[in-house]
Regions:
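A short helix->loop->beta-strand "cap" motif at the edges of active sites that frequently abuts
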Residues: 145-149
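Catalytic His-Asp segment of secreted/periplasmic serine-dependent ester chemistry enzymes
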Residues: 13, 159-238
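Oxyanion-hole/transition-state-stabilizing segment in secreted/luminal serine hydrolases
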Residues: 68-84, 93-131, 135, 151, ...
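Generic structural signal for well-ordered alpha-helices
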Residues: 100, 134-139, 172, 176
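N-terminal secretory targeting modules
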Residues: 1-62, 72, 76-77, 143, ...
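Conserved beta-strand scaffold positions in the cores of enzyme catalytic domains, especially
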Residues: 62, 83-85, 187
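N-terminal cationic-hydrophobic initiation segments that often serve targeting/anchoring roles
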Residues: 104, 138, 142, 179-180
Length: 238
């Protein structure tokens, strides 16, 4: 006489047969991949370049968005000061925070020139949020490198983002105040000479009316180099 399939003995045998298969299925499941950070590929390229040719310690580190990344002549412009460019285009102030321990502190720079804000405002972030991210950047960097000087550049005007200029001005006001009250930080106004009658000077920009041309970078070179060599009106606090 056939035993019913639902008898205790049959059910027990089925359980013993299926249990190893379930274990194999669980073991074969791939681990969940960590979420990839924005700009991870750009940062990895810098890290690979550093392995082949490590930047000098004590150099001036330029970090920030495309206004830094596209400053391809910065090493020549800052000479004889050694300069390292680690800009990554499209970045916001919050993005730089993700990579402090990879493209900032490992270089042990003597000073840092920092530029963000353009893309933050374009994405809808508020001046106070930018100021807070810059403050966090300063705190994290100086916790690792207490002697480093940090020069925060003003948010620049541009014809393509003229509507954001009032917010940029408010951001610059907050950044200036942050520098005044923070040890080892200086604010550098690169925006003033880029204006004429309150509007961005179009002759300083590429056809996209956002990124600067050589004439625009010539202004930045003169102002930033003066600050780095101690000839600026607002010096970093010792």
């Amino acid at each position: 006489m056939n035993k019913p399939l639902h008898s205790p003995r049959v059910l027990c045998l089925l359980f013993l047969v299926l249990l190893p298969a379930q274990g194999r299925t669980a073991e074969a499941a791939p681990p969940a991949e960590a979420k990839k950070l924005p700009f991870e590929d750009e940062i990895k390229r810098y890290e690979e370049a550093d392995k082949k040719s490590p930047p000098p310690k004590g150099a001036v580190l330029f970090v920030g968005s495309s206004s830094i990344r596209m400053w391809r002549s910065v090493a020549a412009d800052m000479a004889p000061l050694p300069a390292v460019n680690r800009g990554f285009g499209g970045s916001k102030a919050s993005d730089v925070l993700n990579f402090i321990d990879r493209i900032v502190t490992p270089y042990e720079p003597g000073s840092i020139v920092y530029y963000e804000g353009d893309n933050d405002l374009q994405s809808g972030r508020k001046p106070e949020q930018i100021r807070d991210d810059v403050k966090t950047f300063v705190e994290k960097v100086r916790a690792a490198l207490p002697q480093v000087k940090i020069y925060v550049l003003s948010v620049k005007p541009s014809p393509s983002r003229a509507r954001l200029w009032p917010s940029a001005q408010e951001t610059n006001k907050l950044l200036r105040e942050l520098a005044k009250e923070t040890k080892g930080v200086a604010y550098i106004d690169v925006a003033g000479e880029m204006l004429k009658d309150g509007q961005a000077r179009s002759e300083l920009f590429l056809k996209d009316n956002l990124h600067m041309n050589a004439e625009g970078y010539a202004i930045w070179t003169r102002i930033v180099k003066a600050a780095l060599t101690g000839n600026e009106p607002e010096k970093a606090k010792q």
